[in-house]
Amino acid sequence: MINKFKFYLIFLKLILILVNCQNSLNDYGFGIVDESSICTSYIGDELCKNRLSNSESIYTTPGGGGGGGIDKLSQISTLPILQKGFQSLTFSQGICKDLNFIEFGMCDSALSPCIETTPKITPGYNISLPQRVCKSVCERMLIGCPQLAIQIDCSISFLFPKIGTFYNLTKYGYTANGGMYMVPCIDTEINYEKNKVQENVGFLESCPYPLLLKNSTDPQYAEKRGYTYLTPTNCVLPCPIPNYTKRQMDSVINMSKAMSSISFVLSLFNVITFGLLIKKKSKYNVCIALMAIGSSFIYLSDIINYGVGIEKQLCPEPGRVATQRVDSLCGFTGSIFHIGITLCVLWSMTMGIVLYSKIKQFKLPNFRYFLIGNLSFTVVTLIILASAKKFQGGNGFLECWMRDRWYVVAIFWIPCGIALLLGVLSICGVIFEIYKISKNVSLKDSKVVIRELKPFVLVVTVSASLIYLFVFYFDSESKYDFYKKGVEDYILCLLTSENPLDECYTVGPNFNSYFMFYFLIRFFGILFFGIFGTSEIARNAWTESFFVTKIKSKISITTVSSSTRGGGGDTSGIKSSSSSSNSGVCNNNNSTRKNYGDDFNSKNLSQPDNTIITNNNNNDNNNKMEIELDSIDI
């Protein structure tokens, strides 16, 4: 019985010994010997400088460097992987802790310290062996940043031994311990505590290309100077922001260049025609001239931008958008653009009100109030924006303008939204009145309605375009959080993509909507010219202008002189013809004057609404009833 009891005790001891041996073996890793590996110094990259436990001896795989030199391929190929890891940590600052220590651990893991055996250990051989990071270091890294567990498994004893790693060196003459040579693991915490104090080594941020690393605490790189920081990092978005492909952006820029240039010339034509050549100034002509001036200012800002160079103007430095605080030209073009877009909105509203008042035949306040009000609003808002230095280029925008959300809403969209509403209500009233009028107009008199449709089409088109811009802006603002989430996806793409410039884009408004936004703004000048610059009024203004009259006079004198010298005969016929021609011009002028309002002011204003145009076969009576907006005197 006693012998049996002793047997059980001995058996239990054997089991405990085996368990302890197994536990002891679990504290070690087993490595593979690579005869081609050597111990070399660190190549000196800033990424792991002062973060390595032994920068003088790094486990390195040599390449085929010529001239007897050592090509440290393993270090060179490891650094991009380490950089990706540092970039991931940079964007984990709001989630992870102890990031500085994690960087130390990552450097020691990827660029392992190296131990070289002596001839005493391996006679005739110099074997280089890596010194792996201790398991405790790995566990501390995961405690600081649990999301690293996706990529790091601390249970792999080959990479993270608790005590050390065994290497079988029997082949190289090592006989002790059964030929198993043990290399102790490296405790990164010792190096971390030393270098953190002595070398003042802090957390190193790294930004994936094309993001740029700037110091947000440095006034030179402050956000108000045009840098867009991806908090909580010091990485800034590139400029211009990559919402769309290069091909798409080139199409928008090329369209804008072509249409802005054409619209600028055509807008100037309308300014000269309706602002200078037409001598009888009416409310209607003034509205056209001031809208044309507004559109000219818009396109002038474009021409300046493209003359300087759109990217140089809007992105004067890598990662920085132009701001009024730093770039005076941005403030200048922003002011021009603001004047232009504001005038277009306000005079579009005014023209709608003028149209409706003419159709309904009610008296408006003195037109000078519209002039003073519209121009005062434009100047006052410009002064506010310029004094607050709110003009700047925007990521994804093609011009300098105000970008502060509250300024944009309070100074532009709310008042101009009200103006648009008044214009739309006026247009709705005009539509209804034209519908009533058109029912009472015969087919042969339909030119009366068609003539009145021209200003109507302009105001409708401009108002619809401005409403589209209004909707586009607030739709984009309402999706701000969605676009912000898109930046996170963009960063993730940058961290994982091999070709980020061609594969990674931020999220912005739909490209077709974005293209239409800029197309409509740059189409105003062409639209104005198509409706008014080609009209009979414009043609007559140029025909009767001083320059054309002078040219005609010279041609006429030359013709008469030539005839006199050639024939020497009776010139009475010529004189008679000339007199008749002049008489015809006078008659035409009288007729034109009659059609543009002399008759209207005396007779039409007394007519009730339902008799503005009647279905009468008498053409003279119809002419008296025509709605000619050019007769609305200021």
Curated annotation (Swiss-Prot):
<feature type="transmembrane region" description="Helical; Name=3">
    <location>
        <begin position="336"/>
        <end position="356"/>
    </location>
</feature>
<feature type="transmembrane region" description="Helical; Name=4">
    <location>
        <begin position="369"/>
        <end position="389"/>
    </location>
</feature>
<protein>
    <recommendedName>
        <fullName>Frizzled and smoothened-like protein D</fullName>
    </recommendedName>
</protein>
<keyword id="KW-0472">Membrane</keyword>
<keyword id="KW-0675">Receptor</keyword>
<feature type="topological domain" description="Extracellular">
    <location>
        <begin position="309"/>
        <end position="335"/>
    </location>
</feature>
<keyword id="KW-1133">Transmembrane helix</keyword>
<feature type="glycosylation site" description="N-linked (GlcNAc...) asparagine">
    <location>
        <position position="168"/>
    </location>
</feature>
<feature type="signal peptide">
    <location>
        <begin position="1"/>
        <end position="21"/>
    </location>
</feature>
<feature type="glycosylation site" description="N-linked (GlcNAc...) asparagine">
    <location>
        <position position="126"/>
    </location>
</feature>
<feature type="topological domain" description="Extracellular">
    <location>
        <begin position="390"/>
        <end position="410"/>
    </location>
</feature>
<keyword id="KW-0175">Coiled coil</keyword>
<feature type="transmembrane region" description="Helical; Name=2">
    <location>
        <begin position="288"/>
        <end position="308"/>
    </location>
</feature>
<feature type="transmembrane region" description="Helical; Name=5">
    <location>
        <begin position="411"/>
        <end position="431"/>
    </location>
</feature>
<dbReference type="GO" id="GO:0016020">
    <property type="term" value="C:membrane"/>
</dbReference>
<dbReference type="InterPro" id="IPR050949">
    <property type="entry name" value="GPCR_Fz/Smo-like"/>
</dbReference>
<feature type="topological domain" description="Cytoplasmic">
    <location>
        <begin position="279"/>
        <end position="287"/>
    </location>
</feature>
<feature type="transmembrane region" description="Helical; Name=1">
    <location>
        <begin position="258"/>
        <end position="278"/>
    </location>
</feature>
<feature type="region of interest" description="Disordered">
    <location>
        <begin position="560"/>
        <end position="624"/>
    </location>
</feature>
<feature type="glycosylation site" description="N-linked (GlcNAc...) asparagine">
    <location>
        <position position="215"/>
    </location>
</feature>
<feature type="topological domain" description="Extracellular">
    <location>
        <begin position="476"/>
        <end position="513"/>
    </location>
</feature>
<feature type="topological domain" description="Cytoplasmic">
    <location>
        <begin position="432"/>
        <end position="454"/>
    </location>
</feature>
<feature type="topological domain" description="Extracellular">
    <location>
        <begin position="22"/>
        <end position="257"/>
    </location>
</feature>
<keyword id="KW-0812">Transmembrane</keyword>
<feature type="domain" description="FZ">
    <location>
        <begin position="34"/>
        <end position="178"/>
    </location>
</feature>
<feature type="topological domain" description="Cytoplasmic">
    <location>
        <begin position="535"/>
        <end position="634"/>
    </location>
</feature>
<keyword id="KW-0325">Glycoprotein</keyword>
<feature type="glycosylation site" description="N-linked (GlcNAc...) asparagine">
    <location>
        <position position="243"/>
    </location>
</feature>
<feature type="transmembrane region" description="Helical; Name=7">
    <location>
        <begin position="514"/>
        <end position="534"/>
    </location>
</feature>
<feature type="compositionally biased region" description="Low complexity">
    <location>
        <begin position="572"/>
        <end position="592"/>
    </location>
</feature>
<feature type="glycosylation site" description="N-linked (GlcNAc...) asparagine">
    <location>
        <position position="254"/>
    </location>
</feature>
<comment type="similarity">
    <text>Belongs to the G-protein coupled receptor Fz/Smo family.</text>
</comment>
<feature type="topological domain" description="Cytoplasmic">
    <location>
        <begin position="357"/>
        <end position="368"/>
    </location>
</feature>
<keyword id="KW-0732">Signal</keyword>
<feature type="compositionally biased region" description="Low complexity">
    <location>
        <begin position="609"/>
        <end position="622"/>
    </location>
</feature>
<feature type="transmembrane region" description="Helical; Name=6">
    <location>
        <begin position="455"/>
        <end position="475"/>
    </location>
</feature>
